[in-house]
Amino acid sequence: MSRRCEITGVGPMVGHNVSHSNIKTKRRFMPNLTKVTVLSDALGQNVTLRVTNAALRTVDAKGGLDAVLLKARDEVLSPRALKIKRQIKAKLAEQPAA
């Protein structure tokens, strides 16, 4: 399982530890990933995703998983999140416009 957020696509980054004497050694900055279960309003079911805590705050701020997935670019989404996005689009398309 890759260390990559399924919604934002954020992965490990590379940088340096810098000592007091300014000696630089390579290090990796890992994303703060959490396995969460989020309710999809359109599908009416729970979805389990591995996301960063920053992405989880975005889901709360934007008003739910559906809104975040519909606005997200397809390139950054994981295959599982992309499949959920397509299911949400199909479900919303079959509902009558009110």
UniProtKB/Swiss-Prot annotation:
**Which is an annotated Pfam family here?**
Ribosomal_L28
The name this protein goes by in its record: Large ribosomal subunit protein bL28
Example of a GO MF term: structural constituent of ribosome
Keywords, comma-separated and alphabetical? Ribonucleoprotein, Ribosomal protein
Q: Which GO terms describe its biological process?
A: translation
Provide GO CC annotations from the record.
cytosolic large ribosomal subunit
Q: Does the keyword Transferase apply?
A: no
Q: Which NCBIfam families match?
A: L28 (TIGR00009)
Cited HAMAP family: Ribosomal_bL28
Q: Does the keyword S-adenosyl-L-methionine apply?
A: no
Protein family according to the UniProt entry: Belongs to the bacterial ribosomal protein bL28 family.
